[in-house]
Amino acid sequence: MILRFRSKKGTLRAEAQPTDLFDVAFKKLTEDLPDIDPATITLATSPTGKQEPASRLLGKTVQKLGLNHGDMLFVSYTDSAPRAAVEAVTAETAPQMTAAHIRDATKQLPVDDYLEKQDGKIKRQLSALQQRKFGSRGMGEDTLPVDPWDEEYLKEQKIKHMSYHAYVKKLNSQANKKNGGGYIAPLNVSDFGVSKSCTGAHAPWPEGICSRCQPSAITLQSQPFRMVDHVEFAESGMINSFIEPWRQSGTQRIGWMYGHYEPYELVPLGIKAVVEAIYEPAQSGEYDGITITEITQADGQPQPPHIATAEACGLVPLGVIFTDLVDAGNGDGSVICKRHADSYFLSSLEVAFAGAMQARFPNKSRWSPTSEFSSKFVTAVISGNPKGEIDVSCYQVSEQCEAMARADLIEPSINPSVLLVKEATKTRYVPDVFYKKNNEYGRTVLQGANPQLPVDYMLVTLTHGFPQDPRPLFSSGLSSFPVENRELIGVTQSPQALGKALDSGSAGGAVSNFHLLSYIQSMGVLSAEEFQLLAKVATEKKDEDVSRLVASEGWNNLLLIIQ
């Protein structure tokens, strides 16, 4: 049936069934009258009849309201400001209030809270000549402290990427002057998907789209900052233990890195990821790749043992580490160098995987309009270096790469140095993608990336190393208890192995092993409180906690099981 609406802009029509709610016809009316305030609409059955607020008719069927095919309703309303003007006002006011609220409400990592309070200014050392010239307290222009994002200083120190907090302070100095007006979130979160909150007069995507809700063309740029500057492995034995399955079987290995973040003094306002444990999920290793077979956690199901163990020990997921090793066949332990400047550093498959993982582990930030910005999740590769030695390399992918992964725009190719931009479908909108390159005349030009895209534009390199004075969180030694999921090389976790490990030393020292803790957690013998106490014993090693653990019911039940 057709209902007619007479307004000062003419007669409008809306189609509805007798059993439909009046809301169906009202929605069509408001779409045909976009520049009005819907809250002011009133309806009458005659030009001089009593006007009824339209809101009172909503929620009732057309039939119940006594409306028939061809009936005409007379519409009155108040004109509102043009939509563009309303959106302009909203854009100027609402985001400022929202950004300030998000800034104050967002809970960041402790390392971020600490670093954002530091000014990061770099003090220059005075030469003997400058000390004679200016005195101990005097300063010339070339001896004043410099900002942590100073390009000349970073170049002098051979720092390729400024730190995340230096980047935030640089943007903040431009966006929010000390005596300026309202607060503006300095970080810009890339979003290459179709807007789902478009106010245009069309059906939501994928049924409809307009120039306001479709994403703009993407111009890829090398990222000038990095979210993490350095990866520190708590002890070198951790890497040796991780590559042992490759040494015995020749197959590759993957693991999840757990640890915490600390300030990194060698980069202004830098952050380092300190790896305390590597958990090896269930996997099927091949000579040239890996398939993770660990069952994904279902909604409402208990957390996997390694995640629950990490949380109990105060650790967070830091990243992923995997091997790509091929023996050189020289009989001296040397390996083939596959990754270098003339081939690739991370393959397109690995870049796509890293982008998806970083999008899965977003970084909380008070300086983002969404409370999240990029990720601190890192990717570490153990492979051969140009000297034929086994070495570690650490990377992240850019924030733009994360956004492209979220929007389902990229996929790997058979060429390891080239990503592919996916084709558009009915449900996937693909904007134009460009990147800058030097042409045959040495000029910088924009190159279309549809469909191929060099992976170099996505990579951010990190440094790595080991502490000079190792003080690992877990002290029982990596050989004290079998590592999980190593059945391929004849290594199995069992109650007998647990009993042997616990008999090897004091309770406090014997349980200080991440793999042992994860195994105990998987047994389900200890209560949540008892396991939390066990984790505290393993990480803090206090005598009073050991006494409480030994006296607990769950611990004694565990000892009975493994006897």
Curated annotation (Swiss-Prot):
Entry protein name: Nuclear protein localization protein 4
Described purpose of this protein according to its UniProt entry: Involved in the import of nuclear-targeted proteins into the nucleus and the export of poly(A) RNA out of the nucleus. Has a role in the endoplasmic reticulum-associated degradation (ERAD) pathway.
Family: Belongs to the NPL4 family.
Compartments (UniProt record): Cytoplasm, Perinuclear region; Endoplasmic reticulum membrane; Nucleus membrane
Stretches assigned to the MPN domain: 231-373
Main location group: cytoplasm
Keywords recorded for this protein, A-Z: Cytoplasm, Endoplasmic reticulum, Membrane, mRNA transport, Nucleus, Protein transport, Translocation, Transport
Domain of life: Eukaryota
Gene source species: Yarrowia lipolytica (strain CLIB 122 / E 150) (Yeast)
Gene Ontology MF, one: ubiquitin protein ligase binding
GO CC terms in record: Cdc48p-Npl4p-Vms1p AAA ATPase complex; Doa10p ubiquitin ligase complex; Hrd1p ubiquitin ligase ERAD-L complex; nuclear membrane; nucleus; perinuclear region of cytoplasm; replisome; RQC complex
Regions that span the bilayer: none
InterPro entries membership: MPN, Npl4, NPL4_C, NPL4_Zn-bd_put
Any one GO BP annotation for this protein: ubiquitin-dependent protein catabolic process
Topology class, membrane: Peripheral membrane protein
